[in-house]
Every structure is written in structure tokens, then in C-alpha cells.
Design a protein with these regions (language model features):
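Short, well-ordered beta-strand elements
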Residues: 45-54, 77-80
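Short secondary-structure junction motifs
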Residues: 43-45, 74, 164
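Short beta-strand and adjacent tight-turn residues that come in two discontinuous sequence segments
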Residues: 78, 82, 100-101
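Short alpha-helix C-terminal cap/hinge motif
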Residues: 65-79
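Structural transition elements
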Residues: 1-36, 57-59
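Surface-exposed acidic, glycine-flexible loop patches that form ligand/cofactor-binding
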Residues: 35-44
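Detector for C-terminal structural segments
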Residues: 1-10, 56-67, 88-203
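Structural motif corresponding to alpha-helix initiation and N-cap regions
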Residues: 27, 84-85, 154
Length: 203
């Protein structure tokens, strides 16, 4: 973000569980919330449909989620793989229960990921509407103070995830190896690595 040593994700904390302990805690929380909602037995919970665009990566992800939800929570998830056009039509009509959606940004900034969930944004396929969220995003957009801007964006992100409008499942990433005798690899916010500045580590 430029205003501190840490970037937006570091200052905001992890979006989802990234280790075994965290995943176990989230699973326990999910079970408790099902009980709190009145589903004392998993047999009481109705089957749910997971909508996604058919493709090797999505097919594998959908199957993995189906298995995890069944094993951990006892929830029966029916998979519905469709074409991109059918997916778009169903999303726009609100004709879905759960849906996989890959989210990318055109530029390396948190605004690129959060702006699309404003009520009137054409990319808002989930039709999320929250006036307070819109205000937070508007203030962040207009702010000339980078620290305040980041704070407003974090508040908006917390609200979006807290209302379970969406939930991160995984993040794309890349990996590279660099000898200890070299330095200078630059990695941008999209995970792309650049090696033009690699040089000998003379320190």
C-alpha cells in the first residue's frame, strides 16, 4: 500500500485459514453455527447446490469442497457444472445457492478487488447491496490520506466477509528459487516475479 512497511494483506491479517490449526478452528466454528441455527443433526440440513463453470480446475475444486463439507460438516452438496453463459445468466438472476467465482483485479491495489462489490457496480454478479459498504468504498476512493484510505478499505473488507457475501477459498500463486548469492527479484501484488533486477549479493 506504500504508507507502511507492510502491504494491505499483511496489515489486515489473513482472510482465511492457511494452516491445519486454523482450518480445524474454522470447522469447529462452522459446526457450532449450524447447531446455533437449529441444525442439531446434519440430516436436518437440506442439500445445497454448488454452481460453477465446468473446467479442469473448477471441477477439481468443486469436488474437493463437496468432499470437505460432507466429511467435516455432514452437509450434502450437489455439484452443478455449467457453461460460462449459463453461469452468468444464473448469477445475474440470483438463481444459485453457492457459486464458485474467480476474482481478479486489473491493477495492484485492494480497491481493484473490493470496488466490484458496490451495489451499482456491473461486476457485482452476486448482487451484494449494503449502503454502509458503498459509503466506506466511496470515502476510501476520495481519500487523499493513504493511511485513512487503507483503514476504510479494511473496514469495507471486514463488512463484506462478515456478512458472508463471499468467502475466499484459495489464492493463485507462483514460486521460484533463488541462490543465496543473488538478490533483486521483484514480486508484484499479483504474484508475478520479475528477474530483470537480479544481481550478485555483495552484502
Amino acid at each position: 500500500s506504500g504508507e507502511t512497511e507492510d502491504d494491505f494483506r499483511t496489515t489486515g491479517g489473513e482472510l482465511c485459514a492457511i494452516d491445519e490449526e486454523g482450518m480445524s478452528a474454522r470447522a469447529t466454528q462452522a459446526q457450532e453455527e449450524l447447531t446455533y441455527a437449529g441444525y442439531y443433526s446434519t440430516s436436518m440440513f437440506p442439500p445445497v447446490e454448488l454452481l460453477y463453470v465446468t473446467g479442469t480446475e473448477n471441477d477439481a475444486l468443486a469436488s474437493a469442497l463437496q468432499s470437505m463439507w460432507s466429511t467435516t460438516l455432514g452437509v450434502n452438496v450437489m455439484l452443478r457444472g455449467v457453461t460460462q453463459s449459463e453461469y452468468n445468466a444464473r448469477m445475474e438472476a440470483g438463481n444459485y445457492e453457492l457459486a464458485l467465482q474467480k476474482v481478479t483485479a486489473l491493477y495492484d491495489d485492494a480497491m481493484g478487488f473490493l470496488d466490484r462489490w458496490c451495489s451499482e457496480d456491473e461486476q457485482n454478479l452476486i448482487s451484494y447491496e449494503n449502503g454502509t459498504y458503498d459509503v466506506l468504498m466511496g470515502v476510501a476512493r476520495a481519500s487523499e490520506d493513504p493511511v485513512a484510505r487503507t483503514a476504510f478499505l479494511h473496514d469495507a473488507e471486514t463488512m463484506l466477509l462478515g456478512e458472508t457475501a463471499l468467502s475466499p477459498v484459495y489464492f493463485d500463486g507462483t514460486a521460484h528459487m533463488l541462490r543465496d548469492t543473488l538478490r533483486g527479484v521483484y514480486t508484484d501484488g499479483f504474484g508475478n516475479s520479475y528477474f530483470a533486477g537480479v544481481r550478485a549479493n555483495t552484502d
